Amino acid sequence: MGLKLVQVDRDLAERHYDSHRGKPFFEGLVDFIISAPLVALAFDGPNAIAVVRAINGATRPHEAAPGTIRGDFALETAQNIVHASDGPEAAATELDLWFSADELHEYERDVDRWVLAPEE
């Protein structure tokens, strides 16, 4: 788990969007993410990626369901209000990019043994 407020510099932005380098919208993505501070979050838990993506809603705001972050607050796809990793490999890469080891914390909640199924 981790949380921090970040003013993203161009280098970090370009590394974050590296998979879009060379595409016509790359510079717009970089310019937008460096335009203001953002909150970087790292979640952990059962199905964390799927849960966060469901809370975020569809990438295109007009396709996002009401009650999701994008459905309620996003206006345009290019200036996306929220990002979530699309799978475990991307999550590992993005965690390394956005957080140092001392910024991530692990803990066990006592209630977890009562509400979470044991791992198989």
Please report, for each region that a protein language model flagged, where it lies by residue.
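Non-catalytic terminal and connector segments of soluble metabolic enzymes
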Residues: 1-120
